[in-house]
Design a protein with these regions (language model features):
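Short, catalytically relevant binding-site loops at active-site mouths
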Residues: 450-453, 498-502
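Outer membrane beta-barrel transmembrane domains
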Residues: 239, 370-373
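Small-side-chain secondary-structure face that scaffolds active or pore-lining regions
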Residues: 109, 171-176
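Outer membrane beta-barrel strand-and-loop segments of large Gram-negative receptors
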Residues: 68, 200-202, 247-253, 362-364, ...
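Short sequence motifs at beta-strands and strand-loop junctions characteristic
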Residues: 8, 19-22, 68-76, 130-138, ...
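Signature of Gram-negative outer-membrane beta-barrel scaffolds
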Residues: 217-327, 459
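Membrane-proximal, glycine/serine-rich, low-complexity loop/turn segments characteristic
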Residues: 1-116, 129-168, 206-228, 268-270, ...
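Surface-exposed loop/turn segments flanking beta-strands in extracellular/periplasmic regions
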Residues: 51-66, 114-127, 174-189, 227-255, ...
């Protein structure tokens, strides 16, 4: 934070750069500050260009494959940022800031595949594949902040921000195959537009009070409101290279709508008594999820749509951090936290994707978050030029989200989805040693031993029981990093690592 009694004035900078591949960048920024007002503005431009070439030869007992691929990519991005802070009084600040990004990118790849028959009864053939894509990206972010400072160590902070990400892309895939001795071409044309439209609101209210040198309290409220609406489309043509007779692939179509609202309250208390320090906290979260998934028929006929899938949750997340200063250079730490990992939107989409002829993939709207308890015990020892940190940790997890695959007993097809299937346990020991020698050499050595166990499970799905065997593994690794300093040169690093797993 800038001091409020500084002298008023302007300052700014301008820079530009380029590289040998045809890329370029430039930026300009200006700042103004005074006792009453602070302001800044920035604009930047970046141009990317990349040309690549790939060549490969592969052999098998049926065909030998050879190809030479040409790849071209370029993109332009424009970035702008601006902000304003008004010092309404010695204790009150109001800020408004925002950021915009507008970008466009294109790529092209042409790959001629040549297949030479090795086995009897097969014919040589050639397949040309052309892939083109273009993408328009727009990002917007804005933030309002108000802070009231009772004292330097006692304040109330309120923030509201809004962000939006919108992307419109076009992807074209063209295949042309011709067999030796036959001039008739087989075509496979696909056009897949991609439209992403996400937005999010966040509201935060934070209170902090350093009551004494050894005592501090914090409390706050946070709310997030996110919305995602992403359709999936495809147009196909098997009669021409240009796709002049392309029709919509109705089986591929899907619109997925995902909304999540979250409200959280938290409080924490920090206290130090002699050599003993403690921080205890509690966070309560309530959130609700709403998902909708439409096929092509449901998109065009609302009467066919199923009811949106809705679910809400309330959970408490305690935390406790304790430390004890054994001596001036030795400290013990004991920590505990309860955590969660939520499923991401795509894992909740019930649409059955049949693009892969061997496996039907789909999401599971019934998924719940994973919950884990994390325990750690740390010992820290410091010397003037050296330090040693030894950490032991243990983390049991419930409702583990696992990707499972199974063969349906009715239609004989393979399916893949995500389920909350079992419990897991993670434990380990980590050692970190830092050494400084003669002011010119820094060494960091770390070693980690890690054990993971996943319980077996039996889960009913599609009228049958899907089972999974218990699994466990032990892994260890060690790493050393060196940083050397010379009087007239920059530091350089030489990493070395060893890894082993069972």
């Amino acid at each position: 934070m800038l001091k409020k009694d500084r002298k008023a004035g302007y300052y700014g900078s301008l820079q530009a750069g380029a590289n040998t591949k045809g890329g370029a960048n430039s930026s300009f920024n200006i700042n103004y500050n005074s006792k009453l007002l602070d302001a800044y503005a920035n604009i930047g431009y970046r141009h990317r260009k990349n040309t690549g070439y790939t060549e490969s030869t592969q052999t098998s007992n049926t065909y030998d494959q050879r190809y030479k691929a040409d790849n071209d990519r370029w993109g332009n991005n424009l970035f702008t940022r601006a902000g304003l802070t008004f010092h309404a009084s010695k204790k009150d600040d109001l800020s408004l800031s925002g950021m915009l990004m507008k970008g466009k990118g294109k790529s092209k790849s042409f790959t001629p595949y040549e297949y030479t028959a090795v086995a009897d009864g097969l014919t040589d053939y050639r397949m040309d594949r052309l892939t083109r894509s273009s993408n328009d990206m727009n990002m917007f972010y804005s933030e309002f902040n108000y802070r009231h400072s009772f004292t330097d160590r006692h304040f109330l902070d309120f923030t509201v921000d809004y962000s939006r990400w919108k992307s419109d892309g076009d992807n074209f895939y063209r295949d042309s195959t011709v067999w030796e001795g036959n001039d008739v071409h087989a075509y496979d044309y696909q056009y897949r537009p991609q439209h992403i439209n996400n937005r999010r609101w966040e509201v935060k209210l934070d209170y902090e009070n350093q009551i004494t040198k050894d005592m501090k309290v914090e409390a706050g409220y946070q709310a997030n409101f996110s919305h995602e609406n992403t359709p999936q489309e495809s147009y196909i043509d098997n009669t021409s290279w240009e796709g002049t007779a392309a029709t919509e692939d109705k089986l591929f179509y899907n619109r997925f709508i995902y909304d999540m609202d979250l409200h959280a309250l938290y409080a924490s208390f920090n206290y130090k008594l002699g050599n003993f320090g403690v921080m205890a906290g509690l966070r309560g979260e309530y959130w609700k999820v709403n998902t909708e998934s439409y096929t092509w028929e449901q998109e065009h006929d609302p009467s066919l749509r199923e009811k949106p899938f809705k679910k809400d949750f309330f959970q408490l997340f305690p935390s406790l951090f304790m430390s004890y200063q054994l001596t001036e250079s030795q400290q013990l730490q004991l920590n505990y936290t309860r955590r969660l990992r939520r499923p991401w939107g795509g894992q909740l989409n019930s649409f059955r994707d049949t693009r892969d002829a061997t496996t039907v993939s789909f999401g599971n709207p019934e998924l719940t978050p994973e919950y884990s308890h994390s325990f750690s015990l740390n010992y820290l020892k410091t010397w003037r030029d050296h330090s040693l940190l030894v950490s032991a940790y243990y983390r049991p997890t419930t409702d583990v989200i696992q990707r499972i695959s199974y063969k349906n007993s009715e239609d004989g097809l393979f399916y893949s989805t995500s389920m909350n299937v079992a419990k897991s346990q993670s434990s380990g020991l980590e050692l970190t040693l830092k050494n400084k020698f003669f002011r010119i050499l820094d060494l960091t050595t770390s070693a980690n031993a890690y054990y993971y166990k996943l319980d077996g499970f039996a889960y009913p799905i599609d009228g049958q029981m899907v089972t999974g065997a218990a699994d466990d593994r032990f892994t260890w690794n060690a790493r050393m990093t060196q940083a050397s300093y010379c009087p007239t040169t920059y530091p350089y690093r030489l990493p070395d690592a060893t890894r082993h797993a069972r």
